[in-house]
Curated annotation (Swiss-Prot):
Site description Important for tRNA non-discrimination, residues in chain: H34
Membrane found in the keyword field: no
Gene name per UniProt: aspS
GO MF, one example: aspartate-tRNA ligase activity
Name by which UniProt lists this protein: Aspartate--tRNA(Asp/Asn) ligase
Organism: Treponema denticola (strain ATCC 35405 / DSM 14222 / CIP 103919 / JCM 8153 / KCTC 15104)
Length: 590
């Protein structure tokens, strides 16, 4: 029998279709029987339509309707009719009409579901991932995947309009150190040799600049073999772009324009024309992190003066040893925060190596301080409140330690307060640029300098002559884009001088022969008229996650791995047979 092909989607009907015969294809979302009448909510990715099998239908059709189960895939031919006023469902886009079924064809049956398919599935993560094809039918997941598609299309549209070329770089590449472990692919044709899957297209996009393709982009799949933790995925997607003859300002301005265009196109949100710029040092000093959430104010302050005016040994010791006292004024929360709740904040600070969290409550308009360490500052109430901007009803929190620990620990407390006090509006999008990052960071374990981002970022001009003598203060031409407390893009102006690149390799511990072996093809390319260039790589998964109001990138990836880098649906990674191992000249060690 010829299948009934749909003539309209389940979200496409309205009163204008009344009196017309249509064919719908979809899944039975809900079914209910009521006095000889069967109601079916038929679903596809466009929406829901109510289908009715009336009591005047043929006996065969009524019997078929009774036998239908949830998630059966069916075709329905029926007559569109307006619902009675009392039956109009304003919660449904098609709620003014219903379809009187004339024919029903079962295209495919469904077994009993492992979980209910609702607007958003509440099953545990591994069950959702095992039956991902069912999970993806939920309204929330359908909306997330469609949002991802719309956003990606808008990015392509914008960059193409700016004369960027979409160019694919290789997926099988040379293994080079980029921070995380490479995923390795053994070569059957060349025993003992391996390709790597790219952690990013970094080197190849720089070579494209040398090749004369001055504006490149790619929706790039990237692979990193990292330890299972947090919200990491072994494979992820970035909007990779690079520009020749470009300054930092050119890259930042282009990225702002791209985000403005794509946000407007995909979720109809207007972003500001320019994003706030914050130096790395300032971000650490006032927010305690290089990815601050700017949806709420609450800036940290320097409170070293309290070591001088009070008798609290912890503050005095920290300052005398060259450390810092950092303060956070939490407006109007003195009464709300009991000792127990403050201890919860202290636990957040201790994760970042703070020894404790000191506190004071302001009462009587700043004339009195109570609780915590207030007894060490008697008679200094007015000075403390004046310098810190504290008022009656405020809670003041302190961390005293080495400067970096004091900042990051109190920054973690700030982040927790933002969540606890409901200050994080998921419908608000606060972008900012973090600029002037250190080019190098000290690796305590290996007793050497590491690149803070990667080895191909250019130092700022004023540091080039002396960077070998003292790498610590060297700032790079680096920039991160942050959004709502997440780093969503990282980029830099690149090195295009082969001699400067070799100097950077040497500082981070590559001798000349090792650098030549790993990166010789790049420095060789730089010898043939390499243009100045720079770029950035926004993380597609994370940006769409934030747009969707989610907290895990798994919610915006069609087929993610779980937190242990395993796919419960297809049971990957999996063992392979001995023949495949033999062909690849591989032996599994016990």
């Amino acid at each position: 029998m010829e299948k009934m092909q749909r003539t309209v989607t389940c979200g496409g009907l309205n009163k204008d279709f009344a009196g017309k015969t249509v064919v719908l294809n979809g899944w039975i979302h809900r079914k209910r029987d009521h006095g000889g009448i069967t109601f079916l909510n038929l679903r596809d990715r466009y929406g829901l339509t109510q289908v009715v099998v009336d009591d005047d239908a043929s006996e065969d059709l009524k019997a078929l309707a009774v036998s239908l189960k949830q998630e059966f895939c069916i075709a329905v031919e029926g007559l569109v009719r307006p619902r009675p006023d009392s039956m109009i469902n304003k919660e449904m886009a098609t709620g003014e009409i219903e379809v009187k079924a004339l024919k029903i064809e079962v295209l495919s049956k469904s077994e009993v579901l492992p979980f209910q398919i609702d607007e958003k599935t509440n099953a545990n993560e591994d069950l959702r991932l095992k039956y991902r094809y069912l999970d993806l039918r939920s309204k929330a997941m359908q909306e997330h995947i469609m949002l991802r598609s719309k956003f990606t299309f808008a990015v392509r549209e914008f960059l193409t309009s700016k004369d960027f070329l979409e160019i694919e770089t290789p997926t099988f590449i040379k293994s080079t150190p980029e921070g995380a472990r490479d995923y390795l692919v053994p070569s059957r044709l060349y025993p003992g040799k391996f390709y790597a899957l790219p952690q990013s297209p970094q080197i190849y996009k720089q070579i494209l600049m040398v090749s004369g393709f001055d504006k490149y982009f790619q929706i790039a799949r990237c692979y990193r073999d990292e330890d299972a933790r947090g919200d990491r995925q072994p494979e992820f997607t970035q909007i990779d772009l690079e520009m020749s003859f470009a300054s930092r300002e050119d890259v930042l301005s282009l990225t702002e324009g791209m985000m403005q265009y794509a946000f407007k196109k995909s979720i109809n949100v207007d972003l500001p024309k320019t994003f706030e710029r914050i130096s790395y040092d300032e971000a650490i000093d006032i927010y305690g992190t290089d990815k601050p959430d700017l949806r709420f104010e609450m800036k940290m302050q320097d409170a070293a003066f309290m070591a001088e005016i009070g008798n609290f040994a912890v503050f005095k010791d920290a300052v005398s040893l060259g450390g810092a006292v950092k303060a956070l004024v939490v407006k109007g929360q003195a009464e709300a925060y009991s000792r127990k709740k403050i201890e919860e904040l202290e636990a957040a600070a201790k994760i970042y190596k703070a020894k404790g969290l000191a506190w004071i409550k302001v009462t009587e308009g700043g004339a009195k301080l109570e609780g915590g360490v207030s007894k060490f500052f008697e008679g200094k109430e007015a000075e403390i409140c004046s310098k810190l901007g504290a008022e009656k009803g405020d809670l003041i929190l302190f961390v005293a330690d080495k400067y970096k620990i004091a900042c990051t620990a109190l920054g973690a407390v700030r982040s927790k307060l933002g969540k606890d006090l409901g200050l994080l509006n998921p419908a608000e999008f606060k972008f900012a640029w973090i600029v002037d990052f250190p080019l190098f960071e000290w690796n305590e374990e290996e007793n050497k300098w590491d690149p803070a981002h990667h080895m191909f970022s250019a130092p700022q001009e004023k540091y080039i002559a002396t960077m070998e003598e003292n790498p610590e203060p060297v700032k790079g031409d680096l920039y991160d884009l942050v959004l709502n407390g997440y780093e969503v893009a990282s980029g830099s102006i690149r090195i295009h001088n082969p001699e400067l690149q070799k100097r950077i390799f040497k500082i981070v511990g590559f001798d000349e022969s090792e650098a030549e072996k790993k990166f010789g093809f790049l420095t060789e390319a730089f010898k043939y008229g390499a243009p100045p260039h720079g770029g950035i790589a926004p993380g597609l998964d994370r940006i769409v996650m934030i747009m969707a109001g989610e907290t895990s990138i798994k919610e915006v990836i069609a087929f993610p791995k779980n937190s242990f880098a395993v796919s419960p649906m297809d049971d990957s990674p999996s063992e392979v047979d001995q023949k495949q191992l033999d062909e690849l000249h591989l032996v599994i060690k016990e």
